[in-house]
Amino acid sequence: MIDVLFLAIALAMDAFAVSIGLGAKQANTAFSSAAKAKSMLLKLALMAALYFGVAQGVMPLIGYLLGSALLGWLASAAPWIGCIILIGLGAKMLYEAIQGDHEEEELGLDDNQSVDHKLMGTMAIATSIDAMAAGFTLNLLAVNAWLACLIIALVTALFSFFGVYLGRQSGTWLEDKAEVVGGVVLIAIGIKMVL
């Protein structure tokens, strides 16, 4: 079960990084009162937790179900395929962190744009595509996949909620660091699968 927790934390890092960026963007927005600013920050944190948590919980479930269908055909190669998927996802996260590649910028979110449900949904899907690929590897871990997806969703929701507040206080300097941690953890889990 510790592998699931590490996987959940690693998969949450993309959403965490975007949430930090959203919180930092919120810090640059002028409000008519401190109460209005607090209210809008709470709304943004709750939206991030809900959207990112649900997307990160559903996508690995889809990957798990697709992987279950293919596992019979690929049984002998499955650990290596899972290893390659996780190492590839980890390397992608490391590359994006080094390049300073931020999803909210790719989606065209600027300081003057408000975050609505459509934009939040788009960001949630964009940050959870990797989780679908990682869901394939749940077939290779001795865990209940449904429980694992619930844990992934809850961990992502918590990281996203607090990421908004952390971003409000710290700005964007933590975004890349979160992605580095996630990338390293995914690579480590991938290597562990074949050892």
Swiss-Prot record:
It is a multi-pass membrane protein. GO terms for cellular component: plasma membrane. GO terms for molecular function: manganese ion transmembrane transporter activity. The chain crosses the membrane at residues 4-24, 46-66, 69-89, 123-143, 146-166, 171-191. Keywords: Cell inner membrane, Cell membrane, Ion transport, Manganese, Membrane, Transmembrane, Transmembrane helix, Transport. It holds the Pfam family Mntp. It comes from the Bacteria. Coiled coil: none annotated. It is found in: Cell inner membrane. Probably functions as a manganese efflux pump. PANTHER family: MANGANESE EFFLUX PUMP MNTP-RELATED (PTHR35529:SF1). Belongs to the MntP (TC 9.B.29) family. This is Putative manganese efflux pump MntP. The gene is mntP.
